[in-house]
Regions:
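Helix-adjacent hinge/juxtasegments
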Residues: 61-99
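Short, contiguous alpha-helical
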Residues: 5-67, 107-159
Length: 159
């Protein structure tokens, strides 16, 4: 078992599960906003997925074939984009050389690959928490997205 790989699988699983959950929400919940969070749920999820694609591009030097569309993006499309990217993140998570490579953002700022790998995990978790906090404050029961829930769903629990 590879720890970084499981962290990336959890990141993808939790974000996809949250998107799927949000598809069942009424517009007043989706369009709500709360101080201390990024914005509405669709705006926050777009930000998460767009950042995933940007982080991937910086780490690999590859531009994704489909640029992120301008304007409103449906939740279903965000989920599709994450599903397409997930196997590529898994390859990166298994690349033992990547953490030590220097990666450079378009603005010229450089970091070790390990920093960007960690940031991608943290960023997604941070914004998922924003969404869960927003929904919880509105009295909406939220899905479990923790590592325990992921491990159970992935069949990782040992008898």
């Amino acid at each position: 078992m590879n720890t970084l790989l499981e962290l990336y699988r959890h990141k993808t699983w939790a974000t996809l599960r949250l998107i799927e959950y949000c598809l069942s929400l009424d517009p007043p919940h989706l369009d709500a906003n709360m101080a201390g969070t990024y914005g509405t749920i669709p705006d926050t999820l777009r930000h998460v997925v767009e950042a995933e694609e940007d982080y991937f591009s910086v780490l690999t030097g590859e531009r994704l074939p489909e640029p992120f569309p301008a304007g409103l993006v449906r939740l279903e499309e965000l989920a599709q984009r994450l599903r397409r990217l997930a196997p590529h993140w898994e390859v990166l998570a298994l690349d033992t050389d990547l953490p030590g490579h220097t990666v450079t953002f378009p603005d010229g700022v450089s970091w070790p690959g390990a920093v960007l790998l960690a940031q991608a995990i943290h960023h997604a978790a941070d914004h998922r928490t924003h969404i869960l906090s927003l929904l919880g404050a509105r009295g909406v029961e939220v899905p479990r997205l923790d590592v325990w829930a992921y491990a159970q769903s992935a069949g990782l629990q040992v008898a």
